[in-house]
């Protein structure tokens, strides 16, 4: 099988398609660890880690698409198609950093061992990681 030069990547939630386009590489954190996908990668179905950042390198004029992702799956096919199917996701440029900081502080105050609160903290931290990387670009 000939290796294509680009991946087709789509990032979707139950509510909408956040982004779709071509990229050179996808980097995502799964429950098993971080994974990098390039054209020609073997098929994969992976569970995304809560509060993680998905990066699509070689996309857009800026060269990168970043999104905060909380839960979901990543599917990679033989045809170099990568689907990020997230329960909750936001593109970095959509994240209000001050609001995300406030959400993190609130979640940290309330997170005294409750699994739902720990998930809120992870989601807030992921949003800030994605947004901060966007600010630096």
From Swiss-Prot:
Keywords: ATP synthesis, Cell membrane, CF(1), Hydrogen ion transport, Ion transport, Membrane, Transport
Entry annotated with the keyword Membrane: yes
MF GO annotations: ATP binding; proton-transporting ATP synthase activity, rotational mechanism
Principal subcellular localisation of the protein: membrane
Record has Phosphoprotein as a keyword: no
GO cellular component, one term: plasma membrane
A Pfam family the protein falls into: ATP-synt_DE_N
Topology class, membrane: Peripheral membrane protein
Location of this chain's protein in the cell: Cell membrane
Recorded family membership: Belongs to the ATPase epsilon chain family.
Function: Produces ATP from ADP in the presence of a proton gradient across the membrane.
Subunit text: F-type ATPases have 2 components, CF(1) - the catalytic core - and CF(0) - the membrane proton channel. CF(1) has five subunits: alpha(3), beta(3), gamma(1), delta(1), epsilon(1). CF(0) has three main subunits: a, b and c.
Protein name per UniProt: ATP synthase epsilon chain
Organism annotation: Thermobifida fusca (strain YX)
Taxonomic lineage from the root: Bacteria, Bacillati, Actinomycetota, Actinomycetes, Streptosporangiales
Record gene name: atpC
């Amino acid at each position: 099988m000939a290796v294509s030069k680009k991946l087709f990547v789509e990032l979707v939630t139950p509510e909408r398609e956040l982004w779709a386009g071509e990229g050179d590489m996808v980097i995502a954190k799964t429950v098993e660890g971080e994974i990098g996908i390039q054209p020609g990668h073997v098929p994969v179905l992976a569970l995304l880690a809560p509060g993680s950042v998905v990066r699509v390198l070689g996309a857009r004029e800026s060269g990168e698409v970043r999104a905060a992702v909380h839960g979901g799956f990543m599917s990679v096919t033989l045809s170099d198609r990568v689907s990020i199917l997230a329960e909750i996701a936001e593109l970095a440029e959509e994240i209000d950093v001050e609001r995300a900081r406030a959400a993190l502080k609130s979640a940290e105050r309330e997170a005294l061992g409750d699994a739902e609160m720990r998930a809120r903290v992870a989601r807030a931290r992921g949003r800030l990681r994605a947004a901060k990387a966007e600010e630096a670009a």
